Amino acid sequence: NFDIHVISRTCRTYNVQGYYIIHPLEVQKQIIDKILSYWQEGYGKVYNPDRADALSRVLWQPDIASAVQTIAERTGKQPYVVTTDARIYPNTVSYSFMRKQLQEGDRPVLLLFGTGFGIEAETMAKFDYILEPVYGPCDYNHLCVRSAAAIILDRLAGEAWWEKN
C-alpha cells in the first residue's frame, strides 16, 4: 500500500506516464484495485484529490511482457526495458546515458524496480539496459524501492541543477 502511494506520487512529480505494478497473482490485482478504488472513487478522492491524480497512472500487469506490450500499443513503439540493481552487469549504463536516451531518443522506456529479492539474473540478462547502482558515501547500497525510485527518477527526469550557476 505504501509503495503504491509513495511511488505513484514520485511518478506524478516526474511526469511518468504509467506506473506498472507487475505481479502474477490475481489476488494482488484485487488488492491494488481496492486501494485505487478507495483513492479514486471513494472517500479518499474527496479527502485527498492530489493522491487520486497521482494514482491515476497506476496499472497492474501480470508480467513484464504484458507491460511491454501495453506500452508498445499505447505509443506505437517498442520500449527499452531498463532495470536497476546494486551490482554491475555487462549492459550496465550510467544515469547520464539513460537521461540522454529519455530526452533525445524516440522510444519509450519501461523502468523496472525489483522488490524483496529483486529480479532474477536470468531475466535481467534479457533487458536492454541496467542502470548503475546508486552509491552513497559508503559501501552500503541496499535502498528500499521507494527511496531508489525517487533518487533514480530524479537523476533521469529531474531538474539539471548541476548545469545552473
What do these predicted regions represent?
Residues 30, 93, 140:
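Residues that form or flank phosphate/diphosphate-binding pockets in enzymes
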Residues 34-36, 95-99, 125-128, 146:
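Short, glycine/charged-enriched secondary-structure capping and boundary segments
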Residues 82-123, 133:
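Long, charge-patterned amphipathic alpha-helical coiled-coil/hairpin "stalk" segments used as oligomerization
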Residues 1-85, 150-153, 157, 161:
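RNA substrate-binding interface of SAM-dependent RNA methyltransferases
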Residues 64-69, 89-90, 137-140:
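A short acidic, often aromatic-flanked loop/helix-cap motif at beta-alpha or helix-coil junctions
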Residues 17, 79, 108-109, 128:
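Conserved acidic residues
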Residues 117-165:
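Structured adenosyl-cofactor binding patch, chiefly the S-adenosyl-L-methionine
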